[in-house]
Amino acid sequence: MVSRRKAQALHGEAPVAFTFLVEKALELGASAAALLPAEQVVVDERVRLKCAVPVCPGYANYLHCPPNTMSVQEFRRTLDRYSVALLVQVESARNSLDLDAEGMGGKSVVELEAELHGDENRALGKLVTKLEAEAFKAGYYYAAGFTGGICILCPECVDLASGDPCRRPLEARPAMEAVGIDVFKTAANAGLPIKLSSDEPVRWTGLVLVE
């Protein structure tokens, strides 16, 4: 039931005309959804720094991870052309307490992420692409979606040196972090804050730039 999920129809000055996307997000299974002015999507070069320090396994190894995505500067210029964004969240059954090296059981971050949060990661990806399509069909043909974390649609990404294209281009999307979006500040601006290292369920967060 939509009434049992958290919906933030408007935040800031996001136009009422776009509330159909919030309703659609909840209908499609989002735990929470909110509209916000695109100017409240926070971009910070330090987010990309955290892709490299400490280095993420996806860095330079995945098509939708840095440095293979658009630069932070290019994304910031592109973001300036948008006025409305939709932020969505998919809640996990697990909390966000940190795991130390021993708690990881010798597994890589990618393996652990797929094992612990794979269902939510894939659910968020499907949700974002469906909402992007809904916005497109409604006439907002510049709609563009972003997910969270490393893409796990394939067991492993294509060999970048081969020049082969993405195997699932209609489903794969870059993470918000990959283009420099500060997910925590942006979620807070949307009225859907995320708490780090807490006993609250992990909230996988995605974004659709609408118009």
Residue ranges and their predicted role:
Residues V2-E211:
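Auxiliary alpha/beta "docking" domains used to position bulky ligands
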